[in-house]
């Protein structure tokens, strides 16, 4: 049909298709398709050089339910468009690319097509969950600090400059906080009684969890190339994949969002940007539909909780034959992972010496599943950093201007005797030990470990546990801390090396505490003051964990014995008898000045180990004729990638 669109232009328009959403080209036509729930008047507006030239009312002929779609003849000119919904001008929720200009002080968002991109011979790493070391970061905050030593600070390109650092640390997966387009500022409602200083005021949306979002477009201000952020984003993905690093994206959807919209969104990012997986925030309904989407079958999907009964038809339980099959079949075909804070809360409480936590910690330590992986983390953006976790009892969010109402009150933290910054050596030494203890808990548990950016060298937010609006040194990773905490950084690197090397940490199934191989020992066992007799009473803060190498399937199948003393007093813990012809050799003790020890004395004759207060010791099995070199090399041996990355960093010129 032919319609008069305004007083100046006549053109042919026709009803569009219901798919794809957003702007697309259909042969010689341009299609505009969007979803706007509710009975509202919807108009499509076309713009040229900041001036509105065309307006099309979409209600009626171009409407199917809440979906609106129209096609107009294609043009070689750049097409800018917006929608007017209920009298309010908004950008296409499915826009693939956004621009801005100011018109009478009002921000108008416009969208168009994305540029072509040459992926060359790029190949996704396709890591198994059991192999993953996840690193959660904020694109801008990760490299924005002046000491980050990158040229393109706070951008996708800047993150690429940190690839050698990620490889040196041992990271093979990064989880990006929201980096799609979102409003940079939003207003706190004046009627909200929780806020006294910011009633009706505008705050910085640094994290991207509030305000309007455009889930199909990379965030323009996170790109050094403002004209083509999608090209810079894809270049970043290509470089990550070239270095065998997977990229996962976090999405924060409204609770009432249509699950089909989420599927379309994830399919788009998987196809156009080669994203390896997605983390879906809380509150999304019918999430199981996403897990069953065939297009996303080879992508990793993280969510707070997956209903295994609905997805797989049964709950996991102990079965002798199933356990043997899971042990022998270590391909790890899992694509789903639970992402919740159970490990965080339990590990923090156990770390600071709360009573009644030993049994619960033993449970989260071994938590794993044949069908759904478990993401373990002890810190993330929603709470204290690792350094602040051992430095503050209370949150200090004064800079947020909300009179302390914001941020969680349950931090499960302990300041080690002094609130905040201090020069007391005893306090500082205890804090460092507690940080080491936390990292051992994280990397030696059975789930998939996730490290929060900067924790590996003691990054601090000065006690702020909710830096959602702190686009400054409070919310950024402070790279100047790395030089001051080099010893702790090296400690974390060694833990990651051990995690990757030893097969007992790379199980793709649950450990049941059963001897289903009839080999004389269960896959995992618990111990106390006396071997084989764990104390799970409320007063106990002592626990030994034996991971049997007989159930491991890998190049290094040695057993590991980890002993935790989270009490404020020294204690002795029993030794389980090693396998015939083997002995226990001390690998590390967080109470020692040099945590990774070069001890040549074995523990073959000893029945117990004396532990300092608030410390963790790790023992590795070795044959009685083994030299100590093999054991000590376990903690100091770095793979080729890490060595090459360290050399590359050392040779880099310092950038301003």
Protein language model regions, located:
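Carboxylate/His-rich catalytic cores and anion/metal-binding grooves
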Residues: 167-203, 383, 391-395
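Carbohydrate-binding surface patches
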Residues: 30-33, 37-40, 526-576
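The feature marks proteins involved in alpha-glucan
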Residues: 1-29, 53-57, 62-138, 143-150, ...
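Conserved alpha/beta catalytic core and glycan-binding cleft of carbohydrate-active enzymes
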Residues: 103-109, 274, 287-458, 466-470, ...
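Aromatic- and acidic-residue-enriched carbohydrate-binding clefts of CAZyme catalytic domains
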Residues: 148-155, 186-242, 246, 253-272, ...
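C-terminal accessory region downstream of the catalytic core in glycan-modifying enzymes
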Residues: 495, 568-601
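C-terminal beta-strand-rich structural cap/linker in extracellular carbohydrate-active enzymes
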Residues: 36, 77-80, 600-639, 643, ...
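Conserved, mostly hydrophobic/aromatic
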Residues: 34, 83, 137, 166, ...
């Amino acid at each position: 049909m032919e319609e008069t669109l305004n007083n100046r232009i006549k053109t042919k328009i026709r009803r569009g298709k219901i798919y794809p959403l957003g702007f697309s080209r259909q042969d010689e036509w341009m299609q505009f398709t969007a979803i706007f729930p509710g009975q509202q008047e919807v108009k499509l507006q076309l713009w040229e050089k900041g001036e509105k030239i065309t307006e099309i009312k979409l209600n009626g002929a171009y409407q199917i339910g809440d979906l609106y779609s129209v096609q107009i003849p294609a043009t070689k000119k750049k097409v800018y468009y917006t929608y007017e919904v209920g009298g309010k001008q908004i950008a296409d929720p499915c826009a693939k690319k956004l621009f801005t200009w100011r018109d009478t002080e009002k921000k108008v968002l416009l969208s168009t097509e994305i540029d072509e991109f040459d992926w060359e011979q790029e190949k996704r790493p396709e890591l198994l969950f059991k192999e993953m070391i996840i690193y959660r970061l904020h694109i801008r905050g990760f490299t924005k600090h002046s000491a980050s030593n990158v040229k393109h600070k706070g951008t996708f390109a800047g993150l690429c400059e940190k690839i050698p650092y990620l490889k040196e640390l041992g990271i093979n997966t990064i989880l990006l906080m929201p980096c799609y387009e979102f409003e940079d500022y939003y207003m706190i409602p004046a009627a909200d009684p929780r806020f006294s200083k910011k009633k009706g005021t505008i705050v910085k949306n640094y994290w991207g969890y509030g305000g309007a979002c455009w889930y199909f477009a990379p965030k323009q201000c996170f790109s050094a190339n403002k004209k083509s952020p999608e090209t810079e984003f894809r270049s970043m993905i290509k470089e990550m994949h070239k270095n065998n690093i997977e990229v996962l994206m976090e999405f924060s959807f409204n609770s009432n969002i249509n699950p089909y919209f989420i599927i379309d969104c994830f399919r788009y990012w998987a196809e156009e940007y080669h994203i390896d997986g997605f983390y879906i925030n809380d509150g999304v309904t019918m999430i199981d539909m996403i897990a069953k989407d065939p297009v996303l079958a080879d992508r990793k999907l993280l969510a707070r909780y997956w209903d295994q009964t609905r997805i797989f038809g049964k709950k996991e339980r102990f079965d002798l034959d199933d356990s043997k099959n899971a042990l022998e079949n270590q391909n790890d075909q899992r694509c789903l992972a639970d992402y919740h804070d159970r490990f965080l809360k339990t590990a923090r409480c156990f770390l600071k010496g709360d009573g009644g936590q030993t049994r619960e910690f033993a449970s989260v330590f071994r938590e794993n599943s044949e069908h759904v992986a478990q993401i373990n983390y002890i810190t993330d953006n929603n709470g204290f950093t690792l350094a602040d976790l051992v430095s503050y009892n209370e949150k200090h969010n004064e800079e947020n201007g909300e009179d302390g109402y914001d941020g969680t009150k349950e931090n499960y933290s302990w300041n080690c005797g002094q609130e905040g910054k201090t020069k007391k050596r005893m306090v500082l030494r205890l804090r460092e030990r507690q940080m080491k203890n936390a990292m051992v808990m994280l990397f030696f548990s059975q789930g998939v470990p996730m490290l929060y950016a900067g924790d590996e060298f003691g990054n601090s937010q000065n006690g702020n546990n909710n830096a959602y609006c702190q686009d400054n040194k409070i919310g950024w990773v402070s790279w100047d801390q790395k030089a001051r905490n080099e010893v702790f950084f090296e400690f974390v690197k060694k833990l990651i090396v051990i995690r990757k090397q030893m097969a007992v940490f790379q199980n793709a199934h649950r450990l049941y505490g059963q001897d289903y191989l009839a080999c004389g020992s269960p896959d995992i066992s618990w111990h106390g003051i006396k071997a084989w007799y764990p104390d799970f009473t409320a007063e106990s803060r002592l626990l030994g964990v034996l991971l049997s190498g007989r159930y491991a399937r890998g190049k290094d199948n040695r057993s590991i014995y980890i002993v935790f003393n989270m009490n404020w007093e020294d204690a002795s813990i029993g030794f389980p008898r090693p396998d015939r012809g083997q002995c226990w050799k001390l690998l590390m003790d967080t109470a020692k000045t040099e945590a990774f020890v070069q001890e040549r004395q074995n523990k073959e004759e000893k029945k117990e180990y004396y532990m300092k207060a608030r410390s963790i010791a790790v023992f590795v099995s070795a044959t009685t004729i083994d030299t100590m070199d093999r054991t000590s090399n376990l903690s100091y041996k770095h793979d080729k990638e890490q060595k090459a990355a360290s050399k590359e960093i050392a040779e880099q010129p310092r950038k301003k």
